[in-house]
Amino acid sequence: MPKFRQTSEIIKLMAKKQDIRDVGIIAHIDHGKTTMTDSLLAEAGLLSPKIAGEARALDYLEEEQKRGITIKTANISLLHEIEGTPYVVNLIDTPGHVDFTGKVTRALRAIDGVVVVVDAVEEVMVQTETVTKQALEERVRPVLFINKVDRLIGELKLNSDQVQSKLLRVIRDFNNLIDLYGEQEHKEKWRVDPAKGTVAFGSALHRWGFTVDLAQQKGIKFSDVVEAYQKERWQELQKTIPLHDAILSMVVKNLPNPVEAQKYRVPKIWKGELESEIGQAMLKCDENGPTVICLTSAQMDPHAGLVATGRTFSGSIREGDRIYLVGAKKDYRVQQVSMYMGAFREVVDRIAAGNISALLGLDL
């Protein structure tokens, strides 16, 4: 789908909070979250499919490209349609390296759900546990993508039964993290289960993936995937079970919209009085209430200056609005409001509660 068509449609849909998903991607380093994101961008028409997985489109800082890791939080708004209904998925690609867990925590404040990416060969690692624990502490709901299934077949030479056995162990270990760190009222519902569509399997590098329900719709079995690699026909999987469909459908169907999420997240992440006008507006994700934005990051643009990224929890933000920065204890005039499209920003007139925005004019 071409970029500009998507941008215009996304702007219209931003007002429909029930059709918004604010989600992040978290993982142990090198488990493939940025490669997965590149595949999603390729489908959106923002990246050539030929270089998806190699371009590192959200790693737009020179240091990130050079070191091959994601350091600062990057953002993209994607359009995904299910049964004729379009949804906006505001996607954040977060750091996976142990040195940058503070940036992960800030990013988690802005989102309501996460796709946790786990390497099928390496399985759940220390940093997987660290970032999953952080997400659960912020009341951010997880779903699971088990990546690099191709390595189980191509490198380890596992058969269909052996592949499934290894994947079930990853799911078990991941659910153990939810049991260990999840809050009592959420952990049972948030445990991932392939039968419920909260687990996807695939290869981000080869751009295919599926959930159980998607595989049933397409008539695909694990043995078909194994055979595709054994006969070197894995490219066919990109067409039959494209990765973007599995990931975005899993996100839309299982992760909460801002109205649902803020009811239980605001009491955890906001220390103000919930019965106040601001508190009630945040709990309801009310775009007509007082404007409250949680700023999660800032980076320097050589042309525009400092760009602040934030999630609007209530109210709305327009160019020319004056906002008070609690940390700086000072008013600032918003010079520009935009939405993210990878390394680029699309200027918009207004961004309402429940959405992620980029703001110019704030001196953080």
Description of each model-found segment:
Residues 1-364:
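Structural and coupling elements of P-loop NTPases
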